[in-house]
Amino acid sequence: MRLGKKQELFADLISEHIQWLYGRGYRVRIGDVLAHDRHKDLSNHYIKLAADLNLFFDGKYLTETENHRESGEKWESRHELCRWGGRFSDGNHYSLIHEGRM
C-alpha cells in the first residue's frame, strides 16, 4: 500500500480509536503525530503514520505503559498493520507499519 493511502487509513483508524477510548471513559490529548526531530531514526512520526496518545482516566494522567494495555491491544486488533508501542516500552505510541518500520 502506498504511503498516502496508509496515511488515510491511519487517520481513519486513529479517529475510530479515540472515539472508542472516549466511550470507555478515557480522555485523550493528542501528542506528536508529525515530528521533525526528537524521535528515533526512521520513526513513523516523520511520515505521519504514528501518534502519541496521552490518556487520562478519572482525571489521572496515565503515564505507565501498562495503563495503555487495554487501549494498545484494542489498537492492534483494528488492522493487521496497527502496532502499539507498549511492545517496546513506549505505551502511548500508536502506529501503522510501513516498509518494516513502526
Positions of PLM-derived features:
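Extended, low-complexity, intrinsically disordered C-terminal regulatory tails
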Residues: 13-41, 81-85
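Stable alpha-helical elements in mature extracytoplasmic
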Residues: 10-17, 67, 71
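Acidic/histidine-rich, surface-exposed loop or edge segments in extracytoplasmic proteins
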Residues: 1-3
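Catalytic cores and adjacent binding grooves of peptidoglycan-active enzymes
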Residues: 46-102
